[in-house]
Amino acid sequence: MGNLRSSFVFFLLALVTYTYAATIEVRNNCPYTVWAASTPIGGGRRLDRGQTWVINAPRGTKMARVWGRTNCNFNAAGRGTCQTGDCGGVLQCTGWGKPPNTLAEYALDQFSGLDFWDISLVDGFNIPMTFAPTNPSGGKCHAIHCTANINGECPRELRVPGGCNNPCTTFGGQQYCCTQGPCGPTFFSKFFKQRCPDAYSYPQDDPTSTFTCPGGSTNYRVIFCPNGQAHPNFPLEMPGSDEVAK
């Protein structure tokens, strides 16, 4: 009976190990509330300053992203709106957020057993961010950052309340590498790249912006406002936002 019980416990541990490839820890260090969002797993969570949310990501997860929503106001049923990053007016996101929003993107246990991950500004910028493996292993498996004052320095053409749009959102078209086909960096993509060299600045910015870690043995951490404070141009709380659903 004892051996049977031990075997069952071992089976459960093995099943958990097999099912989850990584944990994604999301932490808010901003001096304001951030409503974190995660798809296709996780949904959403209110994070006051200093709070953390841990997401268990299954093996093979791909096209996944984590972002922060700002100046949100949700009712007790989890319905409402956000100034940036809104995902259809719900707390629990099932689709992508409305730009602008700084993105942490990842795909787990893919080609050659590697995790692929990045910070993307292809949907613009709203919150400074660090994305890092908790157990870096060298090479391209190390912390990456986008912490510049992009909102404060945003070109006039891309400015919106609470953030800075990518030109693909504002203008679209091949001129800004928003469609398939050869293209190079533009004035606007250079603006983002110079301030956040680790991050994707336009859709075809792969060579300097994709990072890899060993799949199945690496966990990750996303930190909003990693320096613990926001620039003056970053969003403040909306009136009544302390009455949102938690």
Swiss-Prot record:
InterPro entries: Osmotin/thaumatin-like_sf (IPR037176), Thaumatin (IPR001938), Thaumatin_CS (IPR017949). It comes from the Eukaryota. Highly expressed in roots and flower buds. The keyword Transmembrane helix does not apply. Residues 1-21 form the signal peptide. Keywords: Disulfide bond, Pathogenesis-related protein, Plant defense, Signal, Stress response, Vacuole. SMART domains: THN. One of its GO terms (cellular component) is vacuole. Its main location: other. Induction: By salt stress, abscisic acid (ABA), viral infection and wounding. Disulfide bonds join 30-225, 72-82, 87-93, 141-213, 146-196, 154-164, 168-177, 178-183. It is found in: Vacuole. One of its GO terms (biological process) is defense response. CDD domains: TLP-P. The keyword Disulfide bond applies. Belongs to the thaumatin family. Inhibits the germination and growth of the fungus Phytophthora infestans. This is Osmotin. The lineage of its organism: Eukaryota, Viridiplantae, Streptophyta, Embryophyta, Tracheophyta. The gene is AP24.
